[in-house]
Design a protein with these regions (language model features):
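Beta-loop-alpha module in the N-terminal Rossmann-like domain of NAD(P)-dependent dehydrogenases
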Residues: 98-155
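Rossmann-like dinucleotide-binding domain that binds NAD(P)(H)
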Residues: 188-255, 301-302
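C-terminal segment of N-terminal export signals and the immediately downstream linker at the start
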Residues: 1, 20-42, 46-48
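Glycine-centered short loops/turns at secondary-structure junctions
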Residues: 135, 162, 317-318
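C-terminal active-site/capping subdomain that shapes the small-molecule cofactor and substrate pocket
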Residues: 259-331
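NAD(P)-binding Rossmann-fold cofactor-contacting core
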Residues: 62-92
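A contiguous active-site-proximal alpha/beta segment in oxidoreductase catalytic domains
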Residues: 144-200
């Protein structure tokens, strides 16, 4: 995968008498000051989990390199779960030494990089644009948006303002996925909890975890999706450009869990268990330090296209939906 590295221009020329001292001070600060992280949205459990891990210095390779210093609490003001969480999570994050501001701009004035953790994907475009225009390296937690259209706008803005961003689910790092020989993958069956929220298209709210797994395993060139609705689950059947087929089972009721099976040329692999957020957080912190994007935007956009097509199929009673038609409608 081609990874784009964003390089920032250095300081301009300085007066000769001040050159040594100023450069020395800048260099000293660069190598001694922790990278300051800001969080937008305190209605996600990820906001607290990430902050605790960073403040406690438990992420390998980056134990002393980062600190969360600022946060903006909102977050959805209409989703019941968010309304319930924000006051509690605000108090908890303040207890971790994080200053809470009432404007996103105030957070951006005091940080070097941003975690966009707002649970409501409908707000991500508006909030991301504020961050991107300030050129702050940005991680957007799932879902990147609530539509392919908004996701495209986010990436276009990032390109325009030369701002490094990426978005992914922690399930991309499920045990077994990263070690696959993707050239040998013939198909896959994965499963995920798929609880819904009225404000979001079907899989964007929670089932996106499973779509992330599917695209990470199969690749970004899915060409069609069909949705079959069951009583307690939904089955999503994807076809790829080379004829391969993969399925996603979205669990509506019953035991929640993540997992799956991958069919290779010479073996069948059962994926491991979800190990928490630290593998994802390691990639985020590495990204904040290097500005190298760990997940290709084409994969993120493929996830959104899959979900939009799955929603369309559901609304049309299980009709197979071509992703090219989803994309064409946005032209």
């Amino acid at each position: 995968m081609n990874r784009k590295k964003f390089i920032y221009s250095g300081l301009g020329s300085l007066a000769i008498p001040l050159l040594f001292n100023n450069n020395f001070l800048v260099a000293r600060e660069k190598y001694t000051r922790k990278i300051r992280i800001g969080i937008i949205g305190l209605d996600s459990t990820h906001a607290l989990a990430f902050t605790k891990a960073i403040q406690q210095g438990v992420i390998k390779d980056f134990e002393n390199d980062f600190t969360v210093v600022a946060a903006y609490p909102y977050g959805s003001k209409s989703i019941p779960l968010s309304i319930q969480r924000i006051p509690k999570f605000t108090a908890e994050i303040e207890s971790l030494g994080v200053k809470v501001y009432q404007k996103i701009e105030e957070v951006l004035d005091n940080v070097d990089a941003v975690l966009l953790e707002t649970n409501d994907g409908n707000l991500h475009l508006e909030q991301a644009l504020q961050i991107i225009k300030r050129r702050k390296p940005l991680f957007i937690d799932k879902p990147i948006a609530n539509s392919l259209e908004d996701a495209i706008k986010i990436f276009k803005a990032a390109s325009k303002y030369n701002c490094p961003i990426f978005s992914t689910s922690s399930l991309r790092y499920l045990e077994g996925i990263s070690t696959l020989d993707l050239s040998k993958v013939k198909g896959s069956e994965v499963y995920t909890p798929a609880h819904t929220e009225p404000s979001h298209k079907d899989l964007y709210w929670y089932g996106i975890h499973g779509v992330e797994m599917l695209i990470a395993i199969m690749g970004a060139d899915c060409i069609s999706v069909r949705t079959i609705e069951g009583i307690d689950s939904s089955l999503y059947i994807g076809t790829w450009s080379d004829g391969r087929v993969a399925t996603l089972r979205g669990i509506r009721k019953g035991k929640d869990d993540f997992g799956g099976t991958v069919f290779l040329e010479d073996e069948i692999i059962t994926l491991g268990k979800f190990q928490g957020y630290n593998l994802l957080l390691h990639e985020i912190l590495k990204f904040f330090k290097t500005k190298i994007i760990p997940v290709d935007p084409t994969q993120t956009l493929a996830i959104c296209a899959f979900i939009d097509a799955a929603t369309e199929s559901k609304e049309q009673g299980g009709k197979e939906i071509l992703l090219k038609d989803i994309k064409k409608a946005l032209e």
